[in-house]
Amino acid sequence: MQLLHLAILSPFLFAFIIPFLAKYAKRVHTGWFVLILPVLLFIYFLPMIRMTQSGETLRSVLEWIPSLGINFTVYIDGLGLLFALLITGIGSLVTLYSIFYLSKEKEQLGPFYVYLLMFMGAMLGVVLVDNVMVLYMFWELTSLSSFLLIGYWYKREKSRYGAAKSLLITVSGGLCMLGGFILLYLITDSFSIREMVHQVQLIAGHELFIPAMILILLGAFTKSAQFPFYIWLPDAMEAPTPVSAYLHSATMVKAGIYVIARFSPIFAFSAQWFWIVSLVGLFTMVWGSFHAVKQTDLKSILAFSTVSQLGMIISMLGVSAAALHYGHTEYYTVAAMAAIFHLINHATFKGSLFMAVGIIDHETGTRDIRKLGGLMAIMPITFTISLIGTFSMAGLPPFNGFLSKEMFFTSMLRVTHFDLFNVQTWGVLFPLFAWIGSVFTFIYSMKLLFKTFRGNYQPEQLEKQAHEAPVGMLVPPVILVALAVSLFFFPNILSYSLIEPAMNSIYPTLLDGHEKFHVHISQWHGVTTELLMTAGIVVIGTIGYLSLNKWKGIYKLFPSKLTLNRLYDKLLTMMEKGSYRVTKQYMTGFLRDYLLYIFAGFIILIGGAFAIKGGFSFKTEGMAKIGVYEIILTLVMISATVATVFARSRLTAIIALGVVGYTLALFFVIFRAPDLALTQLVIETISVALFLLCFYHLPKLRLKTKTRTFRMTNFIISLGVGVIVTLLGIASSSQRTKDSIASFFVKHSHDLGGGDNVVNVILVDFRGFDTMFEITVLTIAALGIYSMIKTKVKEEGKSGE
């Protein structure tokens, strides 16, 4: 295992230590120990920027299941490194923030930081592995760990509901994505993303291209909360604020964006990719920003804001597909450039806003915007953080959000000039949707800021006396807003170090024989259409915010009964009721019914498959002749079996069943296997004795009258099982595709096992572990039975078995 693999697995390894630290180092907040790891990982990944800047990549393979082509392959390029730095950098700040947010006296810190480290490791695995099967494994780990984090306050019903909702939706999408990965494997015969990229022409011309693309997009859309799968994200706000700041601003919700960007070289050649990704993203942007305006909970506003911003980034990745048709000029690649830049910007301003909202909740006891107001003088630093964050989110200068929003407008305006995918007619919708979504973004940004910090202070509405947060809680958001300001004045620090290498990863096929991408971001381009669109947003957005009370009645046009949340709840209820009804039909409580299902399934599936494929064919060559003794013993065994079934007392049935076992021992004698014969005799004797001992204490056997249908069903099922098992045995012995392994045991029994008794050597040496674990299972079963017999329950001074 190399250092790269260890870097990804280190959060999981460190998570094992956390419970002990939380238990035995109670004087120190557990977060201080946890903080060390993301900081070290960030420092480890940071120097790799020079490598990706020069166009180099880093690849390391750890074999896992090489026979299936599934290996733990770490591949670091510009895109993966960008996400790794976001995961570890934001993770460090969130961990520092959580130290002051979560009380070591009131909260269970051990589980919280175990879940947080699990999530961090899973996210690193998603963005840094090359094998899609390993990627899927880490993908599902992000869903599992986020479920645990969202449900951290598990005593709250809303927390449990939100956690279950996120798990159900994201895991369903993950299963779809797994199906897409398998389809790609069927096309390319490889699980490696790099090898898939090199077989783009093969994939594009295959009939499974569209199904694979749709399945992978479903996985990405569910994880990145795109319409109509966004409904899990607002309910996930029941998680502690550090979780929201980490998962829902910079990491988990960006996993879908990563997948779309990573698979763009494979799918972006198609018109379907362009339309699906860009339109779903644009519609989600408008839908999320529109619904954010009506929210009254600060975290709900940020949740719908996140939905909108993610849609904005995804729409740009969809539009960037045009570059694969026109070439890698700046005119067509600006959308990808803007998507990457806004990905970074969103992590800064949204992370700071989540932390600011957490501070407000922590220091006032509420997030209800109707109870807040007048906090600007009381919490001036938090106000400054919120001002920079909201203005950047609204796309106003001098903050980084303004630059990426202008680039977003540029990419949408250029769509109208694409002679591609028949966008001439519908191309005008792209900048129109972008502008409408930005207007609502401006309105909810102003609402979040001014409704919270301006107006009248209402101490009677608050659970706590409002005051400024401690310094430790303020440091992480201050760092983030400082980045938001700095990146406006010095954006090209990112251009050359992170954005260009990431674009090289998104467009690897465009660089063959061409020079590298050159990204340069400027604050001023003169009076352009984009600037006029921004001015219009400010004017219309200000009017919309000031007149919000007059037009917010429009939200009543959307009945609560028709919302996606209500639809989700109804579908869940219908599935639960339906599954209960179906289960009630076959879960009768009778063991014979369950055996009937099993045996009927065996007959239909196994018997049907063999019959269709012609598996029931027999060869008589090489078979020994059937002797008189064998015929006699067979008749005795059949007679004893019939007697067992029709016996009128348990004693008779047990004796007849014993005859079957002893007859089998005689077969072993005839076939010259004395050890097996002796073993069978001993086992049969013990079994008969135990049966007699147990049944002696049971009431007398009462023969109940059974219906003809019941008896006929039992007869058909038992006859079918017997016939199929017999046919399978004969067919398998007469249709050997390879030589029998018996000769190997006979030949090497003495040399390798040190014994001449082949059967004993097989049991003790060749399959020694099987024998050992069989004994272990029997021992555990015996202990369980013994404990049941010896355990006595005392009730009212009496004891009973």
From Swiss-Prot:
Q: What is its main location?
A: membrane
* BP GO annotations: sporulation resulting in formation of a cellular spore
Keyword line? Antiport, Cell membrane, Hydrogen ion transport, Ion transport, Membrane, Sodium, Sodium transport, Sporulation, Transmembrane, Transmembrane helix, Transport
The record's similarity note reads: Belongs to the CPA3 antiporters (TC 2.A.63) subunit A family.
Q: Which residues cross the membrane?
A: 4-21, 28-50, 80-102, 109-128, 132-154, 166-188, 203-222, 229-251, 266-288, 301-323, 338-360, 372-394, 428-450, 471-493, 526-548, 594-616, 626-647, 654-671, 676-698, 710-732, 772-789
Describe the subunit structure. Answer: Forms a heterooligomeric complex that consists of seven subunits: MrpA, MrpB, MrpC, MrpD, MrpE, MrpF and MrpG.
Name under which the protein is recorded:
Na(+)/H(+) antiporter subunit A
Q: Which GO terms describe its cellular component?
A: plasma membrane
Additional info? Answer: Mrp-dependent antiport apparently occurs by a secondary, proton motive force-dependent mechanism, but the similarity of several Mrp proteins to membrane-embedded subunits of energy-coupled NADH dehydrogenase complexes raises the possibility that there is a capacity for electron transport that could provide a primary energy coupling option for Mrp functions.
Q: Which organism is it from?
A: Bacillus subtilis (strain 168)
Q: What does this protein do?
A: Mrp complex is a Na(+)/H(+) antiporter that is considered to be the major Na(+) excretion system in B.subtilis. Has a major role in Na(+) resistance and a minor role in Na(+)- and K(+)-dependent pH homeostasis as compared to TetB. MrpA may be the actual Na(+)/H(+) antiporter, although the six other Mrp proteins are all required for Na(+)/H(+) antiport activity and Na(+) resistance. MrpA is required for initiation of sporulation when external Na(+) concentration increases. Also transports Li(+) but not K(+), Ca(2+) or Mg(2+).
- State its location(s): Cell membrane
Superkingdom of source: Bacteria
Q: Membrane topology for this entry?
A: Multi-pass membrane protein
GO MF annotations for this entry?
sodium:proton antiporter activity
